[in-house]
Structure formats: C-alpha cells, structure tokens
UniProtKB/Swiss-Prot annotation:
NCBIfam families according to UniProt: PRK00630.1 (NF001884), PRK01002.1 (NF002169), PRK02967.1 (NF002815), PRK04460.1 (NF003381)
GO biological process: response to nickel cation
Family stated for the protein in its record: Belongs to the transcriptional regulatory CopG/NikR family.
KW Transcription (keyword) present: yes
List of residues binding Ni(2+): 80, 91, 93, 99
Known function: Transcriptional regulator.
Entry superkingdom: Archaea
Organism for this UniProt entry: Methanococcus maripaludis (strain DSM 14266 / JCM 13030 / NBRC 101832 / S2 / LL)
InterPro entries given in the database record: Acetolactate_synth/TF_NikR_C, ACT-like_dom_sf, Arc_rbn_hlx_hlx, CopG, CopG/NikR_regulator, Ni_resp_reg_NikR, Ribbon_hlx_hlx, TF_NikR_Ni-bd_C
Single GO MF annotation: DNA-binding transcription factor activity
Classification via Pfam families: NikR_C (PF08753), RHH_1 (PF01402)
Protein name: Putative nickel-responsive regulator
Length: 141
C-alpha cells in the first residue's frame, strides 16, 4: 500500500460544490481520489511546460478579477519586463468582474515559461493557460 499523508485545505463554497458535481458525474469513489487525480494532472502539465526548449511561438491566456488590488498594474509591469517576447496583447471584458488578456509571445521557451509563471502567481489571477508551437519550418510534414 502507498503511504498517504492527510492534509486540510480551504476552498470557496461554490468551487467545492462544482468540484463535487464533477466527482459524482465521473464516478469517483471519494473526494480524495478526485483530488489525487487532479494533482496528477497538474503535475503532468507542469512537467510538460518545464520540458519545453528552444524557440517557440504561442499564447498566454489570462483571466483575472479586475477588482483585485493592483492586479492590472502588476500584469502590465510584468509584461513590460518581457517586452522582447511579447508580440501583441488582446484585452476583453468577460463580465462586470472579470477580464481576459491574450498575450501573443515568440522567443525562448525558458523565458516564455518564466513569464507565464510570474503572471500565474499574481493575486487576482483566476486562470492562466499557455499554448505553444514550434514556429516556422520546424513543423513535421
């Protein structure tokens, strides 16, 4: 049997309710198993992102609560620190509380990962998704 550690976490009520619906829908035996599965998925994504190398082009999509203190200013300042990677940005109002920014990037994969990590860690950021491709003629036929 695998050693297990018991942990405690705090979640917003609506987030847990939505997660519980998915647990039931997918037929998990327990909430713990669903959380373990979610953590495994997160670890796989993290390893994939951090294994990228070389020149890449892609997008960083960010959803954030624009009422969160200084979040827009912090995101803008971070983007200015990586201006050599950023080709363009698109800003969209999703609803009264949330905005989405799509940042088009091209450059070294390591620097793109670094930029993504900095954007992700900001308070008020709800979700970040990095999508990258190999630019130019390096696409398999």
């Amino acid at each position: 049997m695998v050693d297990m550690d018991r942990i405690s976490i705090s979640l917003p009520t609506n987030l847990l309710a939505e997660f519980d619906e998915i647990i039931e829908e997918r037929g998990y035996a327990s909430r713990s198993e669903a959380i373990r599965d979610s953590i495994r998925d997160y670890l796989i994504k993290h390893k994939w992102i951090h294994s990228l190398e070389g020149e890449r082009a892609g997008t960083i999509s960010i959803i954030y609560d624009h009422h969160s203190t200084d979040v827009m200013e912090k995101l803008t300042n971070i983007q200015h620190d990586y201006e050599k990677l950023i080709v363009a940005t698109i800003h969209m109002h999703l609803d009264h509380d949330h905005c989405m920014e799509v940042v088009l990037v091209k450059g070294d994969a390591g620097e793109i990962k670094e930029l993504t990590d900095k954007l992700t860690s900001q308070k008020g950021v709800k979700q970040v998704k990095l999508t990258v491709m190999v630019p130019g003629g390096n696409i398999p036929q």
